[in-house]
From Swiss-Prot:
Protein name: Molybdopterin molybdenumtransferase 2
Gene3D superfamilies: MoaB/Mog-like domain, MoeA, C-terminal, domain IV, Molybdopterin biosynthesis moea protein, domain 2, Molybdopterin biosynthesis moea protein, domain 3
Organism encoding this protein: Mycobacterium tuberculosis (strain ATCC 25618 / H37Rv)
Catalytic function, reaction form: adenylyl-molybdopterin + molybdate = Mo-molybdopterin + AMP + H(+)
One of the GO BP terms on file: Mo-molybdopterin cofactor biosynthetic process
Stated family: Belongs to the MoeA family.
Cofactor(s) the protein needs: Mg(2+)
Misc. comment: Was identified as a high-confidence drug target.
Alphabetical keyword list: Magnesium, Metal-binding, Molybdenum, Molybdenum cofactor biosynthesis, Transferase
Superkingdom, natural source: Bacteria
One term of GO molecular function: molybdopterin molybdotransferase activity
Length: 405
């Protein structure tokens, strides 16, 4: 029987790191930069006003007070976007708007609040300080400076900076494209009437959500009955567009195990096809599989919903995030005090649904350990990680908890 650590290693080694691509800014949010970005121009691009007010020579406002304002004629209006470069003559003012280019010769901006707001002439009621309220070209970014770095997450602020620099695209590591397939002839689509012997299919919805939560993209979700031809048709249709295939169900030791049957058939054996089916010393999630379909990595998970989602967390989420260069590939591990005793099967690393109290530093096992009890997992915020050599855990014991929040 394979250990959890060994199976984690096998899955991680199979996953391929993404190669950088260039995408429009509108598609880059949340991705990781695949290279450094050098500023093609300075920011601000030109000296501009930080206030609505009047561009002046500071010396022309000497001694101005509310009681004794300095009167200056207004020679020009400069709105934001005006293209021609003006020159301010001595003992005059230009009315100027926020973001408008500062005229040559002006050394300060007097805010409109410190004036009478005149149009033809203006009463300056405050002595100007040289350089005040002028945004100098390059004070934020100098042209040629590396402003964004390889491995940096593309946040809204990063997109804003890129756009301000005139960049329409960014180099990024793309999202991994994942195909999710559920198997079982007993599965019915949610919202349709259940026939005798059927249950509603939940794994594809759940696993697709987990894929997106990990930062990847879902190529398609599909459901195959216990029919090798139907399962193979889904692979043939979608696998070419996927970087990873995840299946659930059909990997145990009984009859009608469609995933095992498919990869035992001549169509999916040899060449760049092949899946290794193993038992992993864990609960839930003992039956596992890993391999390739036409060169595309595939991870086959058990069909019970809790087993499928726990297996995703343990084996798929970390290398999936690593392949995309995303930070924090592993769920945070917390040390917490167990509030009630429990038992665990000998020889298996057990992951139990848990409620973690972050403030108190305590944890309690939540619900029965059976792999079909999805309700308890939906309400849990952690996974208790119990080593395979531990059989009994007393209340008060410190345990590791995977924080799912």
């Amino acid at each position: 029987m394979r250990s959890v650590q060994e199976h984690q290693r096998v899955v991680a080694e199979m996953m391929r790191a993404c190669r950088p691509i260039t995408v429009p800014l509108t598609q880059a949010q949340g991705l990781v930069l695949g290279g450094d970005v050098v500023a093609p121009l300075s920011l601000p691009v030109f000296d501009n006003s930080a206030m609505d007010g009047y561009a002046v020579r500071a010396e022309d406002t000497s001694g101005a007070t509310p009681q004794n304002p300095v009167m200056l004629p207004v020679a020009e209006d400069i709105p934001a976007g005006r293209a021609d470069m003006l020159t301010l003559q001595p003992v005059t003012a230009h009315r100027i708007m926020t973001g408008a280019p500062v005229p040559t010769g002006a050394t300060a901006i007097v805010p409109v609040e410190a004036t009478d707001g005149g149009v033809d002439s203006v009463a300056i009621r405050q002595q100007a300080t040289p350089g005040k309220h002028i945004r100098r070209s390059g004070e934020d970014v100098a042209a040629g400076t590396t402003v964004l770095h390889n491995g940096q997450i593309v946040t809204p602020a990063v997109l804003g900076l890129a756009a301000a620099l005139g960049l329409a695209e960014l180099p990024v590591l793309p999202r991994q494209r994942v195909l999710v397939i559920s198997t079982g002839s007993e599965l019915a689509s949610p919202g349709t009437p259940l026939q005798p012997g059927q249950i509603y299919e939940s794994n594809s919805i759940m696993l697709a959500a987990a894929v997106r939560d990990a930062g990847a993209a879902v190529v398609a979700t599909a459901t195959a009955g216990d029919d090798v031809a139907q399962f193979g048709a889904i692979l043939d249709r979608y696998a070419v567009d996927a970087d990873l295939i995840i299946t659930s169900g059909g990997v145990s030791a009984g009859a009608y195990e469609v995933v095992k049957d498919a990869f035992g058939s001549a169509d999916y054996r040899g060449g760049d096809h092949g899946v290794e089916f193993v038992k992993v010393a864990m609960q839930p999630g003992m039956p596992q599989g890993v391999g390739r379909v036409a060169g595309t990595p595939i991870v086959t998970l058990p069909g019970n919903p809790v087993s499928a989602l726990v297996s995703f967390e343990v084996f798929i989420r970390p290398p999936l995030r690593m392949a995309m260069g995303l930070p924090d590939p592993y769920r945070p591990h917390r040390s917490a005090v167990l509030t009630a005793s429990l038992t665990s099967p000998r020889g298996k690393r057990q992951f139990r649904r848990a409620i973690l109290d972050h403030q108190a530093g305590t944890v309690i096992s939540y619900g029965p350990p059976a792999s079909h009890h999805l309700r308890w997992l939906a309400s849990a915020n952690g996974l208790l990680d119990i080593p395979e050599d531990v059989v009994e855990v007393a209340a008060g014991t410190q345990l590791q908890v995977w924080d799912l929040t």
